[in-house]
């Protein structure tokens, strides 16, 4: 596990240095994904691989001050930025844990789970089983990330996407259908394609 975390930190050092405005195109997708969680005021949600906390403002808008948000992030660089974001905004209902999801102890059960650009977790049976164990019956899991298009002119993007996967993920499995293993652990409700099939939103339910 320590070697795995070291490799994750190495990859995420690169991501942490990317200016956040370059990910501006994901804001609409992020909002749509959070809407798909079907949360409400007072809900609890776990943000698996929360990174710098880019989803926190949108989650806060949904769950409110009476709700709770737990951010799980193995990268020290990323979670330090998430802490700065939380402190700057004055959010009191967000907790952060510097661990992989596989390392997280049994904790309270959540009303939803968000996984944004977490290809390694999408392909971790242990990680997905842990998520399943800590969400409530009927809770939604929403996964978002890039995928390799399997038809049309969009396939021309595949060489570049393959380089992206190699740079940002350890696992290189299921790049055409990153939700494949998730769908074995949860009931699939919908799979939405964005950006001409380059990005997916998977909505599942326990």
Predicted regions located by residue number:
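A short SAM/SAH-binding and catalytic strip from SAM-dependent methyltransferases
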Residues: 112-125
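Class I SAM-dependent methyltransferase SAM/SAH-binding core
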Residues: 46-102
């Amino acid at each position: 596990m320590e070697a795995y975390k070291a490799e994750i930190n190495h990859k995420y050092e690169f991501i942490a240095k990317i200016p956040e405005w370059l990910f501006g195109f994901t804001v609409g997708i992020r909002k749509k994904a959070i809407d798909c969680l079907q949360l409400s005021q007072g809900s609890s949600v776990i943000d698996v691989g929360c990174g710098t906390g880019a989803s926190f403002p949108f989650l806060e808008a949904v769950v409110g001050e009476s709700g709770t948000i737990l951010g799980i992030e193995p990268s020290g660089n990323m979670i330090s930025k998430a802490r700065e974001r939380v402190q700057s905004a004055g959010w009191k209902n967000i907790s952060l844990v510097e661990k992989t999801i596989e390392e997280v102890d049994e904790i309270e059960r959540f009303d939803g789970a968000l996984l944004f650009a977490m290809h390694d977790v999408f392909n971790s049976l242990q990680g997905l089983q842990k998520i399943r164990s800590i969400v409530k019956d009927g809770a939604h899991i929403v996964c978002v990330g890039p995928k390799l298009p399997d038809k049309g002119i969009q396939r021309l993007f595949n060489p570049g996407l393959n380089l992206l996967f190699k740079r940002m993920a350890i696992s290189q499995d299921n790049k055409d259908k990153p939700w494949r293993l998730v769908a074995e652990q949860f009931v699939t409700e919908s799979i939405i394609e964005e950006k001409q099939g380059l990005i997916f939103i998977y909505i599942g339910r326990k």
